[in-house]
């Protein structure tokens, strides 16, 4: 019996190490691709107590130990005084890690409850208040970058939300300047899959704090988009990866935004632009390869992307 437990423990540790390596590699690649972290940076890691931010802090600590540059981390949590919030959990966890941290106490819960009618979602106002407090805290701490735990699925969901409900082809940038113009915000998990983060978080045993202590309901539109993408991921292996790659291979001349591309000046002397267009025939859609080491099944040609049935 003891041998079976030991063997199972070894197998679990192997799987954990393998998953950590993949998340670490994806995070490191995103940091490099977007120059998220530079020598001498002081990174304020926003820690909500959820799986994403716990994983982000864990991986950044790991990368910090072997990075060719020097940077420091300070974890920050905003205690918004929501009923039932376990205020002791994060300080105890962060103390055990030996990482620098700051708990900011601001009763935004009462403000939101006072301003938002009962039954209405509080997320929008809560988010604005939280953002302002975190910007202020970053300045107080002398942070050069603010790290958020959004992952690849969040980025894709935002793209489809904006297309379906906002009429914009706009996602969630891996790196940006904050809306007050004073901070650089980074998303180190931009290349990481949510399902990997969920699995990794479960294996790591983080002291997860529920995100719905305020009683607010999740955004229904985002939930619908998430369900749609999860369904595609199950039915059409590789589609999610291909869509994310598409966000990195934008061809403005083959879209319709005349602010991004000068269509008006095109004439027959302009030459072929970005490969041109076959014009009168339907373009053959290439079957993209699935770049996922966990997918061992053969790709079924019958699952080839049909752009008329999405």
From Swiss-Prot:
- Cofactor list: Mg(2+); [4Fe-4S] cluster
Chain location of the short sequence motif PP-loop motif per the record: 48-53
SUPFAM superfamilies, sorted: Adenine nucleotide alpha hydrolases-like
The protein's matches in Gene3D superfamilies, at most eight in alphabetical order, are given as: HUPs (3.40.50.620)
Top EC class for this record: transferase
Which keywords are on file for this protein?
Answer: 4Fe-4S, ATP-binding, Cytoplasm, Iron, Iron-sulfur, Magnesium, Metal-binding, Nucleotide-binding, RNA-binding, Transferase, tRNA processing, tRNA-binding
Name where it mostly resides.
cytoplasm
A GO molecular function term, named singly, is: ATP binding
Q: Where in the cell is it found?
A: Cytoplasm
Q: A GO biological process this protein is involved in?
A: tRNA thio-modification
Repeat keyword on record:
no
- Positions of [4Fe-4S] cluster binding: 123, 126, 214
Query: What's its catalytic activity?
Result: cytidine(32) in tRNA + S-sulfanyl-L-cysteinyl-[cysteine desulfurase] + AH2 + ATP = 2-thiocytidine(32) in tRNA + L-cysteinyl-[cysteine desulfurase] + A + AMP + diphosphate + H(+)
Function text: Catalyzes the ATP-dependent 2-thiolation of cytidine in position 32 of tRNA, to form 2-thiocytidine (s(2)C32). The sulfur atoms are provided by the cysteine/cysteine desulfurase (IscS) system.
Q: Which family does it belong to?
A: Belongs to the TtcA family.
Q: How does it assemble?
A: Homodimer.
Q: State what protein this is by name.
A: tRNA-cytidine(32) 2-sulfurtransferase
């Amino acid at each position: 019996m003891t041998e079976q437990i030991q063997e199972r423990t070894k197998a679990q540790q192997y799987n954990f190490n393998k998953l950590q390596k993949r998340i670490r590699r994806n995070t490191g690649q995103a940091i490099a691709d977007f120059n998220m972290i530079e020598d001498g940076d002081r990174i304020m890691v926003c820690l909500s107590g959820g799986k994403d931010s716990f994983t982000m802090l864990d991986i950044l600590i790991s990368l910090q130990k072997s990075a060719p540059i020097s940077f420091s981390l300070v974890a920050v949590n905003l205690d918004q005084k929501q009923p039932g919030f376990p205020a002791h959990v994060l300080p105890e966890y962060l103390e055990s890690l030996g990482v620098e941290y700051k708990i900011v106490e601001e009763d935004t819960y009462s403000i939101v409850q006072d301003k938002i009618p009962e039954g209405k979602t509080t997320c929008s106002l809560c988010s604005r208040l939280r953002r302002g407090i975190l910007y202020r805290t970053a300045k107080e701490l002398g942070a050069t970058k603010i790290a958020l735990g959004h992952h690849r699925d969040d980025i894709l969901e935002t793209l489809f939300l904006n297309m379906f409900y906002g009429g914009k082809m706009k996602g969630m940038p891996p790196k940006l300047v904050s809306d007050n113009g004073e901070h650089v915000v980074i998303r180190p998990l931009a290349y990481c899959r949510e399902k990997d983060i969920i699995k990794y978080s479960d294996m790591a045993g983080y002291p997860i704090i529920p995100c719905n202590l305020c009683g607010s309901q999740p955004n229904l539109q985002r939930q619908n988009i998430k369900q749609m993408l999860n369904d595609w991921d199950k039915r059409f292996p590789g589609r999610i990866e291909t869509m994310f790659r598409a966000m990195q291979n934008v061809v403005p001349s083959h879209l319709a935004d005349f602010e991004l591309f000068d269509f008006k000046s095109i004439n027959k002397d302009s030459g072929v632009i970005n490969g041109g267009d076959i014009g009168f025939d339907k373009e053959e859609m290439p079957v993209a390869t699935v770049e996922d080491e966990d997918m061992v099944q053969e790709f079924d040609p019958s699952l080839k992307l049909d752009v008329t049935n999405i």
